[in-house]
């Protein structure tokens, strides 16, 4: 009799455990981590997950995060139960199933900003959003405690958006070499002035660099600030060569970035700052880059491209949600 009761208790606990599920707030972030060792370049591995929720199905891309670990990040957009299953040609990554419960958003979480009609913005929960922005190109890449100081200064200000560079900048030739880069380094040589010349492996990323940017974006979300992330910029001058990547390398970078960061509710995509000064990149690249970002962002975050003074891009194209204009004429 005691033995039968013991089996019954074990059976009940097993069934109860089957119904246990992780909880994540609406427009929060849920992360799946799957250990797997693969042959060849792990950044070549294709991994997706399909999430089925209340009247909604979303497919998101996974990514390799180093240390034999693959991850999938998901931002639930409706409250209720969500069920997921992964897809991959790698057996260890394929068919991983689970479920989560999306609960009400916490305090200060209004969801991502969207376009409201033609001329206005609002958060996903319907709260009106009036952008009051600033720019700090490389605040994330400065050594020491300056990134933390920047966040504290923003918290005390009235700004609710900041434009910032994903790649480091070279405005100052004496700007110190960064402690890390977004790509693996194949080789470092010296030029005639003794300065380092880098040869990059654009097929392999440095997850630590991306994780640092992500932590900064999360810190901004914590104080209610939108992160207008500039994906390319002309302020490299060939020092590191991120302003002249081959088309294939640029597309690969954007796919990896969107897989990692589309689930961040406060992210905005700015394809470039003063894109027309990126003269090593062909004009037609920008359509490809834009399509890559939009097609790999299942949440349709705000997307634009910034031009030089009094120049306008094809903002009427459906991929662009708003204009990013550097011109005093519209307000004169």
Region spans (language model):
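Ser/Thr- and Asn-enriched, surface-exposed coil loops between beta-strands
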Residues: 24-30, 66-68
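Extended acidic/polar, glycine-enriched regions
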Residues: 50-125, 139-141
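Bacterial Sec-dependent N-terminal signal peptides
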Residues: 1-22
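Short amphipathic, basic-aromatic surface patches that mediate peripheral association
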Residues: 32-39
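Short, intrinsically disordered, charge-balanced linker/junction segments flanking boundaries
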Residues: 19-20, 330-332
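Active-site mouth of glycoside hydrolases
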Residues: 110-331
